[in-house]
Amino acid sequence: MKTGILGGTFNPVHVAHLRIAEEVRDTFALDRVLFIPAASPPHKAMEGEVPFETRCAMVRLATADNHAFAVSDMEGGRPGKSYSVDTIRALKEEYPGDEFFFIIGSDSFLDIGSWYDYEAIFASCNLVVAARPGAEAADLLAALPVAITAQFCYYPAEKRLAHRSGYSVYWLAGVPLDISSRSIRGLARLGRSIRYLVPEAVERYINEQRIYAHDG
């Protein structure tokens, strides 16, 4: 089985998350995409202290109508920071027959040298870099820490970095939705409409539960 991994705080989940997951699923013929909310993200302060369970509930609502999308709360049961490499290792142990594709935004990939045990990520699964409009595939090579560039071969025609482990880093261009969870929280905090920025079920849940009414 080919499985995508999309992690994040999902505070809240929005339509760009869903569209990126769907584009990766379609492009790479994935059987499923696992949405994995971060319990304690190492690179991002949790603005507003929205509980992990609430963020998981929003993702479940957002993905309920797509049989290829699933939600895992595995990071909620693990103490300490939610490091991606630990999640990937746990998934590989749980699903030893799966081929994994770790989905990451281009902004995050440019900073991957600061991630915990980042070298092990490249040696554990494929990566798909979802690019913002205007970003170039050549940025893949430029973003790699100098210490590990020799571990890769770059194939510009395929927009792919091949790692010596046999896994690859793929560049997915043309993801046009520039939506941020921060801006959605700001609108919700002010009582403004967030319609069409999040799925209808998520909008209703946010409004009914007043999740961001007292945020910030």
Curated annotation (Swiss-Prot):
UniProt KW keywords: ATP-binding, NAD, Nucleotide-binding, Nucleotidyltransferase, Pyridine nucleotide biosynthesis, Transferase
Domain of life where this protein originates: Bacteria
UniProt gene name: nadD
Entry keyword Nucleotidyltransferase: yes
HAMAP family reported in the protein's UniProt record: NaMN_adenylyltr
Pfam family, one: CTP_transf_like
Reactions mediated catalytically: nicotinate beta-D-ribonucleotide + ATP + H(+) = deamido-NAD(+) + diphosphate
Protein name: Probable nicotinate-nucleotide adenylyltransferase
GO MF terms, alphabetically ordered: ATP binding; nicotinamide-nucleotide adenylyltransferase activity; nicotinate-nucleotide adenylyltransferase activity
GO BP, one annotated term: NAD biosynthetic process
Keyword Transferase assigned: yes
Physiological role: Catalyzes the reversible adenylation of nicotinate mononucleotide (NaMN) to nicotinic acid adenine dinucleotide (NaAD).
Biological pathway: Cofactor biosynthesis; NAD(+) biosynthesis; deamido-NAD(+) from nicotinate D-ribonucleotide: step 1/1
SUPFAM superfamilies registered for this protein in UniProt: Nucleotidylyl transferase (SSF52374)
Gene3D superfamilies, per the entry: HUPs
Family stated for the protein in its record: Belongs to the NadD family.
Enzyme Commission designation: 2.7.7.18
